[in-house]
């Protein structure tokens, strides 16, 4: 059965089932799960790297056992006594993206990954699964977490100061986003806060974020670096910044990311966050966005605003790139419907945007997901395709709206 269909089915079941009580299984605290994903193109493995906890839980408190999107990986938390699934989370990773590169055919590498789940009141089983491009499980592992384990590190104070940029009236039913400074020195924090406000306004200038602005809490974390800027390996420039970001990810000149996920979440300790936007103090064009991991963007250039919004479409919305390359590496195949809501292989288009085709707001236009053939998008242009267009297309707006309501609706 198609993994995308399974997610839709689980969501429908969660809506009709008896509402799960957050307080029955969880404390108002966060359990941080550190993993190492490692391997090569033919063999992959998952390793537990560490556990820590901090006060307060800033993620969703509704639809805990459902997923809005399948992602390229999933975490499932199961109560060890009743066997009930009490929390699920989906994500994507740079590790899985790296597996599509030529290097993965001859070299094994490891990647840090960090995930947050609510702190259980009693022992739970945690299952982690990674999927390949055909939605088959390629790696999995299970482990148990006892909340009284003395080796779970307790963190009770922030590593850096933070400023609230926007506070919703209802903080119990809101989405928490944190801007994080990368490559800003202590004396440049005024610039970081200005850049954060610019990025925030750029996001809220796009529907459906404009109409749902009061559902978001935004903070800015003043994580100072000793030097300004970021590393540019192809130019022989390496800097020791607070988050270790760099261009040339997977030898792609403009691909700006950080592989130091533990550093990133250390910087966010005890801050109200669920989604992360890293602002990099550089004028060189670039960025990256990984679903339920982070949005990372350059700041000093003509396209800062559209880039940070585009990458947020990836990291928050799970949206796919809608552009194509003449020699793109295939990540989407005719026998598998992509989990991303804004592209289709027509394997199961019924779960995508047929309603918008019927209304005339969208169509089926071939080209997207880095491929010229075999993948279709809904509109000629979109924020997920180019920097020039002003808005998300109707397909992306619909997907983003559904996702936001999944998080916030009672």
Language model features with spans:
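Short pre-active-site segment immediately N-terminal to the catalytic Zn-binding motif
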Residues: 189-192, 287-311
């Amino acid at each position: 059965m198609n993994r995308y269909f399974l997610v839709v089915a689980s969501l429908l079941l969660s809506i009709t089932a008896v509402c799960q009580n957050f307080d029955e299984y969880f404390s108002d605290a966060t359990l941080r799960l550190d993993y190492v994903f490692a391997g090569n193109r033919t063999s992959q493995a998952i390793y537990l790297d560490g556990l820590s906890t901090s006060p307060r839980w800033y993620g969703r408190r509704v639809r805990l056992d459902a997923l809005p999107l399948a992602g390229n990986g999933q975490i499932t938390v199961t109560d060890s006594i009743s066997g009930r699934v009490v929390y699920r989370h989906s994500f994507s990773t740079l590790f899985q993206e790296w597996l599509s590169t030529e290097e993965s055919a001859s070299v094994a590498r490891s990647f840090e990954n960090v995930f947050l789940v609510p702190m259980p009141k009693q022992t739970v089983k945690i299952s982690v699964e990674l999927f390949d491009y055909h939605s088959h499980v390629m790696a999995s592992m299970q482990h148990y977490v006892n909340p009284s384990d003395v080796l779970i590190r307790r963190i009770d104070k922030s590593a850096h100061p933070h400023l609230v940029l926007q506070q919703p009236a209802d903080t119990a039913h809101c989405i928490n986003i944190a801007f994080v400074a990368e490559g800003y020195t202590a004396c440049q924090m005024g610039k970081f806060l200005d850049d954060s406000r610019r990025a925030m306004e750029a996001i809220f200038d796009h529907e459906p974020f404009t109409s749902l602005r009061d559902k978001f809490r935004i903070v800015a974390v003043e994580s100072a670096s000793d030097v300004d800027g970021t590393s540019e390996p192809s130019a022989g420039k390496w800097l020791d910044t607070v988050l270790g970001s760099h261009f040339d990810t997977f030898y792609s000149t403009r691909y700006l990311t950080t592989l130091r996920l533990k550093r990133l979440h250390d910087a966010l300790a005890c801050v109200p966050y669920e989604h992360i936007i890293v602002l990099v103090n550089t004028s060189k064009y670039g960025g990256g966005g990984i679903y339920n991991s982070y949005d990372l963007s350059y700041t000093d250039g003509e396209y800062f605003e559209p880039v940070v919004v585009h990458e947020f479409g990836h990291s928050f919305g799970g949206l796919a790139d809608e552009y194509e390359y003449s020699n793109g590496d295939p990540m989407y195949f005719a026998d598998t419907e992509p989990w991303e809501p804004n592209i289709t292989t027509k394997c199961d288009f019924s779960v995508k945007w047929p309603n918008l085709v019927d209304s005339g707001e969208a169509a089926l236009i071939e080209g997207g997901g880095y491929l010229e053939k075999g993948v279709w998008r809904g509109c000629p242009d979109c924020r997920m395709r180019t920097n020039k267009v002003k808005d998300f297309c109707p397909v992306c707006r619909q997907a983003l709206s559904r996702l936001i309501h999944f998080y916030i609706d009672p």
